[in-house]
């Protein structure tokens, strides 16, 4: 403390001892009675209650009104300063009393009363202004002045007060302070008052969060404080009133805990108060949001369920659209007409007629798609054309494993008609076998089932030619529109040839040639319009579309699989087929007839050696072994010497040369999107044996035959012309994949 403050405090103590009676009188009796009268704030009051000069009044405020304290004259310090202490709301309140000095009293307009704590920066200020300003004289120098009460002061604390008159030429620092000390609590209040007991705050106030609950713990107050319980007041920082939670003190422990349940997240203000409201400690705590253990699964379900529902609706919509699209394809074929009703009425009677027996022969070297077409065609012949079809895929493989040749010869003998499905693989391997049938060693493909069957059929065909021309009607060679007539082996040239599905009516009429009187009753039974009347016809349509798609994706699939090249292939321009003929005419639209070569322009390269046929033949004999001697040699085409296997190159025809598309193979409907419908109306034996369609054909397991390796010197050999295929030497410069 500064020396001058210590000196002032000493003089104040001496003055208080000497003038104690005066201070007691100024206090106005008991502190409680005095406080009851003077704790209120007075706006306007008389200058003194004892002077009798009621014509002098002051207006009080808290120094908010700024008046220029500077003046032209000096005004003396206040005289006879006394302090009146009393209790207001269990705290100290003081009132300052003084008298004005005689010097400069005529210039006095008011006083400023400034109260400060000696060891603190806290400051309170009051301002007294004459309500009716007028000039005072020396007769007012004994008039007592009184300030408003100064409230909320501390017990036993040192203060000083300055009374500054204005306007004065002297500054505030030129006026002397008056020091005093507030009285003890037990002097102003009753000794048993709780406000006079020692002040206590808990040393530790711990706040923690457990889920959505808030846990508050603190240490106990000593027993002499007499606290019976505590209250926890809490609220959000920007909320209104406090919420209260009572905490019972446990005497057996050193701490007391309170649990605040279901507290919402936010920034909280927490206050700890005892039951007498004399102890208070505040703290702040941020409650964080807690994620429920069910929040994750609930969120996942909330996201998954709508997605599943949307996906289900999207899938259903897609399926319905595709079904509608397929229905649109067949809708114009399913219109009610006298023809369809006639067909529906005639179908049961057709079932009762004897069914012609048909033996179906095919090549298993053209891939699975071609085998699917063959199998669907067999179903179609049985279901739509009313035939009894013999197909190796439908036979019990375990029973005919060792007797395939005998089974084929038996079926050829028993059948009324023999249908050979010609394809590129059939042409290649049959002609290759015929070309080298004179070889002495066993070939790799000499035991293929279809080679044995074709050899037997060719022998029967040659015998039928010698007997009568009517016997040739038993032998039929068919090819689908992804092949051409040039794919018919030379050994089957004497057979009747049909292109499917263009010549479907003619094929059905051929199969039922002995029943012309029955077919004449319903001529539309086997028309191309009725092609789609049965599920087997639609299944055949899908299988043909899949084969077309496979050829479009890999035009050179056959060459890649069976004709390995030793030299890099010569660059050539791949043919572009704008459309392919579906073989169908919808809504009875008649297509313009044209030669077969307009659709399928094939070049048949009969590779011969530069020195002549004998040299090339001997070279091929050295490269590949011939078939077994048991296999009968078949005659080659009459138009050419012994031919090597033929390779076909497709020439892209001009738009005028291309046949008109009948529209049944709609490019807007990819064949990959169509499914094979189940076959109905089949006999139980055929349904049972049809389960073998996915197994290896009866010709598998007997080995495959590698095609001959063609040397580069034979690439520029002559070109042989055969029935149905035209040679173009200027377009085929080298052997290349299709």
Curated annotation (Swiss-Prot):
Major localization class: Golgi
Residue stretches making up the SEFIR domain: 355-509
Keyword tRNA processing attached: no
Membrane topology, record value: Single-pass type I membrane protein
GO biological-process terms attached to the record: negative regulation of epithelial to mesenchymal transition; negative regulation of transforming growth factor beta receptor signaling pathway
Glycosylation sites: 19, 55, 62, 80, 137, 171, 206, 277
Record's compositionally biased regions (Basic and acidic residues): 720-731
Organism: Mus musculus
Regions of compositional bias (Low complexity) in chain numbering: 667-702
Lineage: superkingdom: Eukaryota
Membrane-spanning ranges: 300-320
Protein known as: Interleukin-17 receptor D
Gene Ontology CC: one annotated term: nucleoplasm
Region annotation (Disordered) ranges: 653-738
Chain ranges on the Extracellular side, renumbered to this chain: 17-299
Cytoplasmic side: 321-738
PANTHER family named among the record's database cross-references: INTERLEUKIN-17 RECEPTOR (PTHR15583), INTERLEUKIN-17 RECEPTOR D (PTHR15583:SF14)
Xref: Pfam families: IL17R_D_N, SEFIR
Its job: Feedback inhibitor of fibroblast growth factor mediated Ras-MAPK signaling and ERK activation. Regulates the nuclear ERK signaling pathway by spatially blocking nuclear translocation of activated ERK. Mediates JNK activation and may be involved in apoptosis. May inhibit FGF-induced FGFR1 tyrosine phosphorylation. Might have a role in the early stages of fate specification of GnRH-secreting neurons. Inhibits TGFB-induced epithelial-to-mesenchymal transition in lens epithelial cells.
GO molecular function, one term: interleukin-17 receptor activity
Keywords of this entry: Cell membrane, Glycoprotein, Golgi apparatus, Membrane, Receptor, Signal, Transmembrane, Transmembrane helix
């Amino acid at each position: 403390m500064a020396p001058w403050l210590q000196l002032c405090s000493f003089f104040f103590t001496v003055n208080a001892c000497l003038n104690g009676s005066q201070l007691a009188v100024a206090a106005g009796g008991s502190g409680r009675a005095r406080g009851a009268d003077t704790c209120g704030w007075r706006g306007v009051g008389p200058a003194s209650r004892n002077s009798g000069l009621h014509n002098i009044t002051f207006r009080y405020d808290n120094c908010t009104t700024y008046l220029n304290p500077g003046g032209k004259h000096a005004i003396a310090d206040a005289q006879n300063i006394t302090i009146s202490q009393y209790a207001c709301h269990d705290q100290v309140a003081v009132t300052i009393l003084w008298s004005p000095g005689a010097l400069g009293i005529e210039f006095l307009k008011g006083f400023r009363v400034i109260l400060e704590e000696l060891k603190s920066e806290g400051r309170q200020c009051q301002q007294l202004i004459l309500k009716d300003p007028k000039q005072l004289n020396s007769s007012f120098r004994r008039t007592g002045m009184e300030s408003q009460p100064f409230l909320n002061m501390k017990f036993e604390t040192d203060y000083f007060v300055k009374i500054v008159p204005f306007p004065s030429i002297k500054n505030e620092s030129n006026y002397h302070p008056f020091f005093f000390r507030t009285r003890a609590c037990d002097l102003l209040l009753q000794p048993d008052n709780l406000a006079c007991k020692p002040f206590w705050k808990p040393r530790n106030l711990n706040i923690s969060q457990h889920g959505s609950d808030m846990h508050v713990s603190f240490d106990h107050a000593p027993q002499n404080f007499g606290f019976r319980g505590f209250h926890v007041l809490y609220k959000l920082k920007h909320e209104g009133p406090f919420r209260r939670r009572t905490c019972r003190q446990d005497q057996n422990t050193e701490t007391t805990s309170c649990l605040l349940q279901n507290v919402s997240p936010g920034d909280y203000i927490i206050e700890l108060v005892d039951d007498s409201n004399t102890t208070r400690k505040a703290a702040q705590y941020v409650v964080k949001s807690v994620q429920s253990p069910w929040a994750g699964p609930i969120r996942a379900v909330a996201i998954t369920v709508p997605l599943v529902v949307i996906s289900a609706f999207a899938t259903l919509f897609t399926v319905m659209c595709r079904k509608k699209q397929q229905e649109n394809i067949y809708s114009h074929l399913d219109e009610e007409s006298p023809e369809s009703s006639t067909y529906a009425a005639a179908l049961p009677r057709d079932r009762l007629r004897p069914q012609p027996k048909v033996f179906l022969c095919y090549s298993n070297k053209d891939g699975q798609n071609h085998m699917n077409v063959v199998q669907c065609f067999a179903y179609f012949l049985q279901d739509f054309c009313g035939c009894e079809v013999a197909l190796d895929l439908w036979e019990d493989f375990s029973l005919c494993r060792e007797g395939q040749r005998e089974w084929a010869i038996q079926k050829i003998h028993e059948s009324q008609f023999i249908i050979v499905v010609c394809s590129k693989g059939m042409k290649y391997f049959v002609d290759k076998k015929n070309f080298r049938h004179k070889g002495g060693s066993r070939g790799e493909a000499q035991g293929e089932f279809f080679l044995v069957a074709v050899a037997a059929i060719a022998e029967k065909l040659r015998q039928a030619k010698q007997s009568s021309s009517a016997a040739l009607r038993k032998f039929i060679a068919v090819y689908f529109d992804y092949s051409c007539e040039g794919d018919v082996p030379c050994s089957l040239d004497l057979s009747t040839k049909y292109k499917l599905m263009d010549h479907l009516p003619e094929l059905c009429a051929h199969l039922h040639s002995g029943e012309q009187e029955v077919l004449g009753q319903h001529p539309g039974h086997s028309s191309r319009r009725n092609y789609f009347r049965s599920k087997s016809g639609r299944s055949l349509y899908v299988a043909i579309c899949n084969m077309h798609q496979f050829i479009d994706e890999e035009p050179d699939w056959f060459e890649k699989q069976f004709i390995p090249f030793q030299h890099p292939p010569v660059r050539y321009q791949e043919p572009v087929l704008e459309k392919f003929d579906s073989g169908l005419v919808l809504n009875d639209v008649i297509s313009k007839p044209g030669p077969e070569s307009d659709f399928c322009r094939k070049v048949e390269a009969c590779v011969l050696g530069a020195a002549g046929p004998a040299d090339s033949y001997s070279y091929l004999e050295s490269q590949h072994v011939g078939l077994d001697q048991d296999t009968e040699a078949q005659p080659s085409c009459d138009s050419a010497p012994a031919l090597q296997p033929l390779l076909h190159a497709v020439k892209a025809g001009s738009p005028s040369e291309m046949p008109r598309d009948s529209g049944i193979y709609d490019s807007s409907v990819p064949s990959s999107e169509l499914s094979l419908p189940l076959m109905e109306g089949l006999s139980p034996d055929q349904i049972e044996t049809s389960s073998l369609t996915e197994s290896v054909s009866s010709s598998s397991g007997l080995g495959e035959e590698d095609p001959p390796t063609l040397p580069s010197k034979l690439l520029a050999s002559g070109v042989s012309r055969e029935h149905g295929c035209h040679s173009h030497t200027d377009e085929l410069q080298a052997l290349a994949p299709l």
